[in-house]
Amino acid sequence: MIASGVWAECIPLSKAHNLKEVPTVASLPTAASAPETMKSALEKIHYLGDVPCSYKSTPLAAHFELHIEQGPHLISAGQRVGVVTAVQAYRWFRLKIIGRDTHTGTTAFEHRADALYAFAQMMVQAREVAAAKGCLASVGIIEVAPGSVNTVPGQVSFSLDIRGPETELVVEVEKELRSKFDKIAAAEGAGIGKPCRVEWTLDFDSPAVKFHEDCIDCVQQSAHAVVADAPVADTKALVRPIMSGAGHDSVFTSKRVPTSMIFVPCKDGLSHHPEEFSSADDCATGASVILQAVVRYDRKRFA
């Protein structure tokens, strides 16, 4: 989504170029190496071009995007095509819990400012609060310091991904979690322990997006045309209107031009996983749908 964000002028080019890789144990920088940036990675593979990336200098009439669903709905229902009508809202945060490093053998529970214990409670609260509002909350990165067997963790940094079908719901989840996290950090209701401090940093904010009706209509008509010869009693049931749970380039392009998306099934609904897979038939179906959708949209434009 970085390139589309730059193209839509929602992400400054300098910010995109300066994005740094998320370090892993295998990629931690040494004294002789700096973390890889987006710009250095593009240079390394000879992809750092000189063509301006902007909707003004390289305009589009519309944008159609083909993607695997990245979820289980199509594959579970035996459906062939998802007509994407919208993308849910999401916000990404980095949080830091600051407690105090102390010895595990000499510090009783009531004297500990245990950042990891506070984090454990926060993670449970995040899931419960999000679920109660029909949203999702996930932690994907956790860093614990100082990282010693016999030291109570004095600091925990973690990511928090909040998603929901409406922007307002995501805001409500965030507001409630801020309040609950403050109480957890203050050791209220825990019965034991000293206070910690929690800090929030917003990394990314993507409001809910509704796609263009003309583009949605073109995708829907094309999907029904492509599956019309399928050997089933009701081919209409093979096509499903769907909201995307994940962010895509279309989120940014939709801010500048009419946009919609096409989903095809993926095995077991898996994505961001080594076993991510879509069959050749499903890929061909998706390619046929996007081709017909583009043709239909052009006819509509010039009618």
What is each of the regions a protein language model found here?
Residues 140-148, 159-165, 195-216, 245, ...:
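A short beta-alpha structural unit
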Residues 9, 14, 163-167, 203-204, ...:
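Short beta-alpha connecting loops at secondary-structure transitions
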Residues 2-168:
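Midchain, well-structured core segments that form catalytic/ion-binding scaffolds
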Residues 49-56, 106, 127-139, 149, ...:
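Flexible, glycine/charged-enriched surface loops at secondary-structure junctions
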Residues 212-226, 230:
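Extended C-terminal subregions enriched in glycine
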Residues 117-121, 285-292:
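Short amphipathic alpha-helical face segments that pack within enzyme cores
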Residues 172-182:
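Short amphipathic alpha-helices in soluble, non-transmembrane regions
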Residues 231-288, 297:
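Zn-dependent metallopeptidase/amidohydrolase metal-coordination segment
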